[in-house]
Structures are given as C-alpha cells and as structure tokens.
Amino acid sequence: MCANSAWAGDVRIPARPFLAAGDILERVESGFDRWFGARANPLRHLGALGFYLFWIIVASGAYLYILFDTSVSGAYPSVQSITFDQPWLGGLIRSIHRYASDAFALVIVVHTVCEFVHGRYGGFRWFTWISGVPLVWLALTSGVVGYWLVWDALAQFSAVATMEWLDALGVFGVSLARNFLTPDSIDDRLFSLFVFLHIGLPLLLLLGMWIHVKRLSQPDTQPARALAWGTLAALVALSIAVPATSAAPADLTRVAAILALDWFYLAPHALMYETSETTLWLIAAGGTLLLALCPLLSHAPRAMTARVDAGNCNGCRRCFADCPYGAISMQPHPDGRIGAELAVVSPELCAGCGICAGACPSSTPFRSVRELVTGIDMLQLPVAVLRARLRDELEQLTAAARIVVFGCVHGADVEALRSVDTGVVLLLCAGQLPPAFVEYALRHGADGVVVAACPEDGCAYRLGARWTRERLLGEREPHLRARAARSAVRMVYCGRRDLRALQQALNGLRAQVPAAKRGNGGVHV
C-alpha cells in the first residue's frame, strides 16, 4: 500500500512506500520507548547495538583463541576443555561468544527490515544502503566458518554442505567436498586456513562497518549504558541458563543422523538439502541483487540541496558541525581574507533537511533587511518564507490565547491542530527551526510555542530533534536567548499518529498562558 505525496505550501510531505508496515513498526518502536526509554530502545539503536555485539564477539573470541588448539586433532579436545574444565570462565565466555554472534545476525536482519520499511534506502542514503549489503555476506560467512573450528559433527555437516554448495558453481575444477571424504583428507594446513578465515573475515567486516557509516556525522556506534549493560546481562543469563556445548566429535566415516542447528547461521544448509544447491544459489543471488537494487527502485524525489550565500556566510562552522550526513565542508572564502572560510555543500551528500539553516547565526527573523538572506538556506523553504509564513499564522489567530506549532513533516500531522487559537508552521525537519523564531513568535503575539519533533532518537534526519532540544535548552549554538519567555515553550517528541502528546502540550500551554507571560522558567522537553 502506497501513500501519495502531497504539498503543504513549499514543504513536501514525504511519501511513505509501506504505509501499513510503517505504522505497525512505529507502534512497536513507541511501545519499546515506553518500556525501555528512547535512549535504551534497541529498535532505535540497532546500528550501535550491532557494533557493541561485534566487540563482544571479538573480546570473547580473543580469549577463546588463546586456549584453542589450531590442529585438527587438538581442536575438539581444546574446545571441550575450555567448556568443561573452566565452566564459569571459559565455558561462560564460549557461550557468550555463541549467543552474541546469534544476536549480531538477528540485529542485522532487524536493522535491514526497519530501514527498508522506513524507506531509508534511496536518494542520498544509497551509499550507506549499498555498503551494508556485503556486510550480510561477511557476517554470515564469519559465523559459518566459526562453527567449523569446533570440529564436531555439526561442524562436519556445515563444512560438507558448504563445499557441496560451492561445487555446484562448477568453477573450481575439482570437487571441494572430496576434501571431507576420509579422515586423512583433513590436515592441519586446511584447518589453519579455517582459522585464518575466521580471523580475517571479521577484520574485513569491521572495515566494511566503518565504510558503512563513513558518510554519517557522529554515527551511532556506542549504545547507551542501560542498553549496553542490559544486553550484556541478557547474554550472560542466557549463557548460564543454556550453555553452548559441542556435538559429538567429527567423524568423516559417518554421517550424523540428528543435529541441533543454529538457525541464525546454518539455516541455508537445511534449505539446500530440502531443495537443491542451484535453488539456494538462485535465492542467495536473487536476494543480494534485490537488496542492491533497492536504491534504484526508490521513487523518492531528489532532495533540493542547501544553498550557500557567500556574502552572508561568515565561516562560523555551525552548519558544518550540525550536518548529519557530512554534506558540508569548509573551504577558503573567495573574498581572499586571511583565515576566512566558506561553507560548501556537496549535492550528492545533502539530505535537504534544513538543519544547516537552523544552525546559521544569520537565520534570525529579527533582521531588519528588506530581503532576509542567510548564510545557508533551503530553496524549497527559505528562512524569509518561513518568517512570512509565521507572520501570516500570527495574524490569523483570533482567540485570546494564541499558540504557534512548528512541526516536522516527518512527524505528527500538525495541520490537524490548526484552529482559531493555534497556528501551524511546517518545517523540513525540526532542526531547521532557528531558535530565534521561537522568541520572534512570542514577541509578536504568540502566548505559547510548541515545537513538534520526530520521536526521541528516531529523527528522520538522525540528529534534527537532538540539535533542536539542545538549542532550546541553551546547550548548543545558536541557542534560545535567556530573555525569551521559556516557560511558554514546549518541545514534544511524537510519531506520525501521535497527536495525543501534542494535544496535551497545547492544553498545558492554554492553561498556563497567564503564568507563561509572567515567568521565565525552563523550556519543557
């Protein structure tokens, strides 16, 4: 089910390619917010959780490698010794290594599905999406090879199945599966290759993960303490309750009849034997191709990029610091002044979110110039148009208590709030709002201001809601000036269907309008 794009003045309400699925996902994310809080919500920090699990896998794997015998004859006994001779150290660490790997695979799948449902795979996001596709293969291969090192019956089954699958390509000249026909066909050299792969592939995976987030400013690679400790506690509890153990030793003269598969990594083997090697290749190749083509299948319009005005850019670097996608660089100013810099926007990286315009110190509506031009601005919604729209909204309010709502087009439907006492100004992102506009609204007749942002840690442009909050609280430049009536300002985090929180904020302001006019308390966020 698709939703058509609509125009709200100069602000385009984004199309939602998977409307029903997106609504369900947002409800689940909101439910997790209530249970865990936004900062500890795993669904809002899947990338950070993936990095965290990767380092747990590396740390636990390093300990296991110290005690591991890399020979064919010594591999299985050494793993058994680690597991049973030191159950509360080696055995626990082995189980954590196993379950962290499973959790890593699960996080990759959920992260991919969530980003796809949210439509975050096309346009300026194409590189991040495409660079994530090889990570799926690297993670899967690393996990499969890790099972081989145990060299039990499950490892034998997985190794033979993998070689039979590769043999189906017919490009190796000789059968790889023949290396596993007799016990004598496996030697220490081949096993050393397995060890090399299990160490080398994660290194490539780490490199790929770095490339994956390379275009992001301040990427979310470290989960909040609550999420980190909670994840570690869950892994430890699971490891104690259901310790990871080995199957019987590998025996190439026999084929195991019953095995307990790890479905996170070894499910393709079962699928291959239920169908055929060719079928599995078609599924693998088709799935990879489909993922790689997703950016081309996106119908999202190309974002209009930010525009820099050299005459008004003073090289303050605020837009450079606040851009979520590293689309802004600083270069020498063309006027030739020593040390002067000019912001330069990369069209390929620009998301068209307007966060840079909200960061620009010249984006203030109090300027008395005839034509309001800022150092950096958005063509589809310039600051001058934003000021004119705010003035129009204030003039149309006729009630005793007058409130202005600044709303992000990716968040709640703030247009539904428009009434005789409530004006609405749409933004490309909450981060596009210069704090001076809040003070301007209050000084030109508004009794209260509500800033409606995306859910906390769920901003459509990653950092917009966060920067807005910090600007209003005076923690980030440009900040809301102290002389503004801060008690009359509310910032609300809300999803597309969440008008209740906005209504509560409006009702609270209506009830506190007299107090807001008198006092100068803190901004409510």
Please tell me what each predicted stretch does:
Residues 311-314, 350:
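Short Cys/His-rich zinc-binding micro-motifs
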Residues 1-18:
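Short, non-transmembrane cytosolic segments of multipass membrane proteins
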Residues 299-311, 366-385:
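Membrane-interfacial segments at transmembrane helix termini in multi-pass membrane proteins
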Residues 51-75, 402, 406-417:
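Conserved oxyanion/phosphate-binding beta-strand-loop segments in alpha/beta enzyme cores
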Residues 98-103:
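Individual alpha-helical transmembrane segments in multi-pass integral membrane proteins
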Residues 25, 31, 35-66, 78-97, ...:
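Membrane-embedded alpha-helical bundles of multi-pass integral membrane proteins
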Residues 318-351, 355-379:
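Iron-sulfur cluster-binding cysteine motifs and their immediate structural context
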Residues 133, 147, 158-161, 231-234, ...:
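Iron-sulfur-associated redox domains of electron-transfer enzymes in respiratory
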